[in-house]
């Protein structure tokens, strides 16, 4: 499943004194099975971009193509329904949208609306919940008797229960404790590597971006100013400063190390494990 943006612009409240163009002339493509991160300052157009992916917003100009379905500002909702079934959207603080009295009912709400096999959806959701550290009897429990972090994970899995091909998540770990953050991010990565799902992550956490993403899209003032690998992105400190994007902690550590020892390691480390490997290699060659 490929998503392509061709010259996409979106204007809020068009034709009024309050109109605001949130994204303009966006051209990009999301390939099946890759992990994308979208980064940029607040107001750079990230959320507007992802809402155009499954036509929660329709382009003011330009086209969004999802496989063989082309979406314009004129496309009727009945033609978009197959797209929405295949793209799971998890917005910020999704726990605020929970409303069913048991986890099981929460899990089958989306699949029921799309007339999916409910037993398959329940089994799939239960497996994902177990991966996130829940007990076996979680399906009979009330989400409203759980902690905020548990409710967040329940809300995320309620979207994943529809088994979408593309998973779009907006700051999914904001406010979570470190263990829950790791659980959520590892689950998303496993869905990419084990089930060939496309992950599109909005995040301000460059540590997450460095560790998990295959490709990073940088947005500034409604435009894409860069689309590259994490390693290439974090090489250019001047551009990062101009875009107001910080360095991951491990990359900053590497730059500090190189400055202190007046050396240059052979590669940029995006994880602690990679840095240790580069450090050992440097020691061996010293």
Swiss-Prot record:
This is Energy-coupling factor transporter ATP-binding protein EcfA2. Forms a stable energy-coupling factor (ECF) transporter complex composed of 2 membrane-embedded substrate-binding proteins (S component), 2 ATP-binding proteins (A component) and 2 transmembrane proteins (T component). InterPro entries: AAA+_ATPase, ABC_transporter-like_ATP-bd, ABC_transporter-like_CS, ABC_transpr_CbiO/EcfA_su, ECF_ABC_transporter_ATP-bd, EcfA2, P-loop_NTPase. The keyword Magnesium does not apply. Pfam families: ABC_tran. Residues 3-246 form the ABC transporter domain. CDD domains: ABC_cobalt_CbiO_domain1 (cd03225). Its EC number is 7.-.-.-. ATP binds at residues 40-47. ATP-binding (A) component of a common energy-coupling factor (ECF) ABC-transporter complex. Unlike classic ABC transporters this ECF transporter provides the energy necessary to transport a number of different substrates. SMART domains: AAA. It is found in: Cell membrane. It comes from Staphylococcus aureus (strain MRSA252). PANTHER family: ENERGY-COUPLING FACTOR TRANSPORTER ATP-BINDING PROTEIN ECFA2, HEAVY METAL TRANSPORTER. It is an enzyme of class 7 (translocase).
